[in-house]
Amino acid sequence: MSNQQIVISGVGLWTPPHQISNEELVVSYNAFADRYNAEHQAAIEAGELAAKPHSSAEFIEKASGIRSRYVYIKDGILDPARMTPQIPLRDEGDLSDQAEIAVEAAKKALAAANKTASDIDAVIVSCAYTQRYYPAIAIEVQEALGIKGFGFDMLVACSAATFALQRAYEMVAAGTARAVLTINPELTSPQNNFRDRDSHFIFGDVATATIIERQETSSSEHCYDILTTQAETIFSNNIRSNIGYMVNANDDDPYREYNYFHQEGRKVFKEVCPMAAAHILSLIHISEPTRRS
């Protein structure tokens, strides 16, 4: 096998200690819906507002296949008067929430790859959201783990993990890094609209990490060849999360539904599934099967 073969040599997974079942989510949401409908009864009857429909555990499972999800902080999510996690604000000198969960996943990936901080040249944090714009979460993680070299953040929504892997692959292939640590600290619950029947059940919180390096430098018990990589993007307005630093300049309300995650689920399904299937098939066709000796 060529010395240029690039592999995934270690993976790490962190899951929160808290879970929310469909049944818990439905009880909370339905209580919120009843409260909302009562408070806006006149506007609803006048046709100025739409009533909030009830949900059910059966509806959620049929629509998504999901029965339960992990969340970073459970407090506040199930409170009909709040409907969002209540996460204590940390001082600037403390490790951020997102860096903390990233570090936990990273340590497991390093252990699986039999690597130390001195073996890593770059850190990529790639996820749907970062909790701040700068300093980069990746550089905060780099500092916490004692890694030299460089780090940067990427935001690529649902494809964040795969885009990070491709960037890592390219850096190792180009020789600009011996090994790259990619981390996906998905802290999505603060942007999940728990007041919306059609999306409140979709996301949870998790952090994953991988080590990418050449096979010749790998000493892990298990490693997996990367056969090829290829990226593709198409713009769509059918899935959005509009919160950003312009919210105050726009004189906008950061808590209105427009600024939370929202989607046209059926349209997203029709856009994404054919594209993803075609993309995967194209990669299979251009990849040469590889068997480890």
Where are these regions (language model features)?
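Short acidic capping loops at alpha-helix termini that bridge into adjacent secondary structure
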Residues: T116-A122, F150, R178-A179, R291
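Short acidic, glycine/serine/threonine-rich loops at helix termini
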Residues: Q19-I20, Y134-I137, L165-Q166, Q191-R197, ...
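Short beta-strand segments
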Residues: S9-G12, S126, L155, V180-E186, ...
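Flexible, glycine-rich active-site loops centered on histidine and acidic residues
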Residues: T176-A207
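Hydrophobic alpha-helical hairpins/lids featuring a short glycine-rich hinge
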Residues: A99-K108, A112-A113, A128
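Single conserved hydrophobic/aromatic residue that forms the stacking wall/gate
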Residues: H285-S293
